[in-house]
């Protein structure tokens, strides 16, 4: 198993832009992360401190996702629907798996669009998932990102993350996932502020997602 990940995202085409990302990211392979196909095993939670709703919320969806993961793409519309239906936060964490060649850069790109507006960043994530099958390389991701930016009236800079801040945020999310105990994507929890019931429940069967949210809202009522 590789212990070093180096990504370089370059374009010399006229009118293109340059994204360069070289990472000595050994931490990426510290856990045997894998994309989820079929029912995943229950995640053994090592550090539950991140599995709680944001301030002011009784219930939330927490997801660790990889933008190149096919099952994350499958889950995305349902999670979006659930968050809107119940008007609860959907907290999305980046967990780019090391076997995927463009997911890390896609996460950085999404955070760039977040700096314009959170809605735009989430629209980019949605579009990446919807077009995932047509994106195989970093160059294709670059072309897709350029088109997305153009459609939404955003000028992409020569370097999308010149100070490395967005890159560090993705790495921090990955490290958080490692501390929690993430081993597959997507990993999804329903978390609650209730003190008399389990504070988080992993969603292993997405067909029960709404049922789990209903139960969490009932349990947290009055808290």
Please identify what each model-predicted range represents.
Residues 36-44, 138-142:
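Periplasmic c-type cytochrome electron-transfer domains
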Residues 31-35:
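Sec/Tat signal peptide C-region and signal peptidase I cleavage site
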Residues 41-59:
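A short beta-strand-turn-helix
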Residues 146-223:
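C-terminal cap of thioredoxin/glutaredoxin-like
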Residues 16-28:
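Bacterial N-terminal signal peptides
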Residues 62, 67, 73-148, 215:
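Structural alpha/beta surface segment adjacent to cysteine/selenocysteine redox centers
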Residues 53-56, 83-85, 102, 179-184:
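Extracellular/periplasmic catalytic domains that process cell-envelope and extracellular macromolecules
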Residues 1-13:
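N-terminal secretory signal peptides that target proteins for export/translocation
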